[in-house]
A protein has these predicted regions:
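N-terminal secretory targeting modules
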Residues: 1-63, 68-74, 89-95, 122-123, ...
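Hydrophobic residues in alpha-helical segments
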Residues: 52-53, 103, 208
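Active-site metal-binding loops of divalent metal-dependent hydrolases
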Residues: 65-66, 104, 134
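Extracytoplasmic small-molecule ligand-binding "clamshell" domains
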Residues: 69, 79, 97-100
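Short gly/ser-rich anion-binding loops that grip negatively charged ligand groups
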Residues: 70-74, 102, 106, 110
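Short glycine-enriched, charge-decorated loop/helix-capping segments at active-site entrances
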Residues: 74-75, 220
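Alpha-helical cap/lid subdomain in secreted, periplasmic
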Residues: 82-98, 107-261
Length: 262
């Protein structure tokens, strides 16, 4: 399935299936796409979508490790949280949108949970995107399902909705025996806790196996971190997954129609 410019609120500017970003190379020829199962979220952030329909300000905290902080990106503006904020603002013209980047490289789930009070709860977000699992896989540690489950419950108790993001599909991750266990644990945790799951692993595997996009189009030379194209595509897919089927508030809908007419 192509990157869903056909969601109800996509503007003409996002009708292209290709995400264009610096540097302008052969990467620009690769299409940003993903299978339906990677984008369905399973448990959508319904209250977040209600805020959109009501025209209320939106705040998201993206917490995670180096692929949240943006290792491999050419600038802070090219990280996935920054690109996500830009995507949401473009698709929701007139709505105040803030995406806070709370990624710290090298962390595993326990270290992230320990930061929740300062980095998540004090921000009072409407939605939390929790990218987790990659460093456990890299260090041959079992992905701690119980710690993640407890963390999700704390996030929910704070009033935020939650979307989990599993490991990236990258050579250094694929070389480790624990990757499937990590993907399975995070999937099961999201399902059991009734929170969203953005299946980054499946989306990136689709790029490689179905779209036949070489790793160097979306992964840096370290074999682990995404480049600007990879982060931009993930941001677009996450935005479309969050917004799919969302009813726009009248002011935003009018602005979007105006953008299409132009």
């Amino acid at each position: 399935m192509r990157c869903r410019a056909g969601v109800r609120l996509a503007s003409a500017a996002f009708a292209l299936a290709t995400v264009m970003c610096a540097p302008a190379t052969a990467q620009d020829l690769a299409r940003c796409s993903a299978p339906l199962e990677a984008l369905s979220l399973e448990h959508a952030p319904s209250h977040f979508r209600e805020r959109i329909a009501q025209g209320k300000p939106l705040k998201i905290v993206a917490i995670g490790s180096s692929s949240t902080s943006g290792a491999g990106a050419s600038s802070r503006a090219a990280t996935y949280p920054a690109r996500l904020e830009a995507e949401l603002k473009a698709q929701l013209p007139g709505l105040p949108v803030t995406v806070l980047n709370k990624g710290i490289g090298g962390e595993e789930a326990p270290q992230m949970v320990a930061r929740f009070e300062a980095d998540v709860f004090e921000e009072a977000p409407d939605l939390v995107l929790w990218q987790v699992g990659s460093n456990s896989v890299l260090r041959d540690h079992p992905t701690p399902g119980e710690i993640i489950r407890q963390g999700v419950e704390r996030l929910k108790d704070s009033g935020a909705e939650v979307i989990l993001i599993n490991p990236q599909y990258a050579p250094k991750i694929l070389a480790k025996p624990g990757v499937e266990q990590s993907v399975d644990v995070i999937t099961a945790t999201a399902r059991d806790a009734e929170v969203g799951l953005f299946d980054r692993f499946a989306a990136m595997r689709y790029w490689s196996e179905t779209e036949k996009i070489p790793f160097d189009h979306f992964i840096t030379a370290d074999g682990l971190h995404m480049n600007d194209w990879g982060y931009a595509c993930v941001a677009k897919l996450v935005a479309n997954a969050i917004l799919d089927g969302t009813q726009l508030p009248p002011a935003t809908a009018t602005a979007t129609v105006g953008a299409i007419k132009r």
